[in-house]
Design a protein with these regions (language model features):
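Mature extracytoplasmic/periplasmic domains
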Residues: 258-316
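N-terminal signal peptide c-region/cleavage motif recognized by signal peptidases
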Residues: 17-22
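A ligand-binding cleft/hinge motif common to bilobed small-molecule-binding domains
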Residues: 85-89, 215, 220-238
Length: 341
């Protein structure tokens, strides 16, 4: 835990917190960003407000499944982070509460759009592009080139050298499928995924698992959000990232208040705090380098430069629909995951 950053965030949010000090005593949060970020959010918020934070860490697919299971008796107040598609699905299913923050005009257009297309049942809190992580030491040792396009990943040389998450549990992997469908067309995308399957060593439960495996020399290449790479590198691991030259998608990490929250005042207070620049800066403090949604948040130089990335016009509304997500994942299970490796 970075004590300097905690002190900074404490000072930055103290004035905001005082007005709410005695109003809310507990908030229950599902956190779908990396563990270090979740932990710092919990610590800083509790110290600045005196509110008890009960935080569970789950991937976005698992988080959505939990909210569905608890819909008649919600035990969660806020869902923080994770890819935006399942947040849109939660909105569609009536699992999240419509709420318009006064801070909305201060957010980037993509974050506001996420709120608008959900009926204000979610909001964008960060964005990050999909790409590849690779271990330069392993690639050199195995005499493998750096993959630069989606097509490169199909080369026989990469057999058993690639990890990606399982789309049934990971929003990262679902973003990959939705990106490929939009980039190639659906049938061609699934033919691609069948060929890619031959080179996959493991489908992990978590979207961050593959890039951590790359950093630790357990695999050569991952399909990951590239903002997860610099944090591993800052810890001394040999890892680099690249976005495919033929185009890629980006996530809009989101935040939602759960409909039926037992601690609604506390949920709204945490929601407002999480949109402030000082709270959003906690991501970089824990070596997470997504692009923050608040325009005034200081952007770390290690955050990917979106201007240098070939991004597709990702249809967040369509691929955030429950039926579309279910259909695409079921097709992947039937046509891809069932194949031998």
């Amino acid at each position: 835990m970075n004590r300097t950053w905690i002190r900074w965030a404490w000072l930055g949010t103290l004035g905001w917190a005082v007005s709410f000090w005695a109003q809310a005593q507990q908030v229950n949060i599902i956190c779908s960003v990396q563990a270090e970020w979740c932990s710092m959010l919990s610590t800083v918020y509790a110290r600045t407000t005196g509110v008890k934070v009960n935080m569970a860490m789950k991937g976005s697919g698992e988080a959505l499944a939990q909210l569905i299971a608890e819909r008649d008796n919600p035990k969660t107040d806020v869902w923080f982070g994770g890819t935006g598609d399942p947040h849109l699905q939660a909105a569609e299913l009536g699992l999240s509460l419509a709420y318009q923050s006064p801070a909305l005009p201060q957010l980037h257009a993509w974050a506001q759009q996420q709120a608008q297309q959900s009926g204000y049942k979610t909001v964008g809190i960060y964005s990050g592009p999909l790409g590849f992580g690779y271990n330069p030491e392993l690639l050199a040792k195995k005499k493998l080139p750096v993959p630069k396009t989606w097509a490169d990943l199909l080369k026989p040389d990469y057999k058993g050298e690639i990890q990606v998450a399982n789309p049934a549990s990971s929003g990262t992997a679902y973003t990959m499928i939705a990106t490929l469908v939009q980039l190639m067309g659906e049938d061609q995308a699934y033919e691609y995924l069948k060929k890619l399957h031959k080179n996959i060593s493991t489908y992990t439960r978590s979207g961050t698992g593959p890039i951590k495996a790359v950093a630790r020399g357990e695999t050569s290449v991952s399909i990951s959000f590239v903002h997860d790479g610099p944090g591993e590198k800052a810890q001394g691991f040999p890892i680099e990232t690249i976005t495919p030259a033929d185009g890629t998608g980006a996530e809009i990490g989101s935040m939602s208040i759960v409909k039926g929250s037992r601690n609604l005042a506390a949920a709204k207070q945490f929601y407002e705090w999480a949109l402030t620049p000082s709270a959003q800066a906690l991501g970089a403090a824990t070596l997470q380098f997504q692009l923050p949604s608040h325009k005034e948040t200081k952007v770390d130089p290690r955050v990917p430069d979106f201007k240098k990335i070939k991004l597709i016009n990702y249809d967040y509304a369509k691929y955030g629909q429950t039926a579309e997500r279910k259909r695409l994942i079921q097709r992947w299970e039937k046509e891809v995951n069932s194949l031998p490796q």
